UniProtKB/Swiss-Prot annotation:
Subunit record text: Homodimer.
GO CC, one annotated term: cytoplasm
Note on cofactor: Binds 1 Mg(2+) ion per subunit. Binds 1 zinc ion per subunit.
PANTHER family xref list: HISTIDINE BIOSYNTHESIS BIFUNCTIONAL PROTEIN, HISTIDINE BIOSYNTHESIS BIFUNCTIONAL PROTEIN HIS7
Stored NCBIfam families: PRK00051.1
Protein name: Phosphoribosyl-AMP cyclohydrolase
Pathway: Amino-acid biosynthesis; L-histidine biosynthesis; L-histidine from 5-phospho-alpha-D-ribose 1-diphosphate: step 3/9
Gene: hisI
Family: Belongs to the PRA-CH family.
Cofactor requirement: Mg(2+); Zn(2+)
Main location as per UniProt: cytoplasm
Pfam families cross-referenced by the UniProt entry: PRA-CH
Amino acid sequence: MITIDFQKMGGLIPAIIQDHATNEVLMVAFMDEKTLNLTLESGKTWFFSRSRNKYWMKGEESGNTQEVVEVLTDCDADAVVIKVKQNGPAACHTGNRSCFYVRWEDGQWVEHSEPLFDPAEVYKK
């Protein structure tokens, strides 16, 4: 039986989130054992925020939730790929569909996407 190795990175593993239909990488976040279990049990993606030191469910503020379609681990069992159905227009807190909208081009980083929503309107605190 395979067991996910949370010890290599101090209790966390990287979680690569992909669109299940297109395989587009939507985001990368971190999970601990609790958030991986919450994800597997609920069918929604849950993560551990290193900057806020708290658990969060994707879409809890924006409504842009993610429904889990498939979960895979790598050969070392220290990372996961989670294929999801993205609900709402965007996975990124910037309003872009994917967090990977900045491309290295001609010696500089260039944004290649327009936000699909205004984060200031969605994340009012």
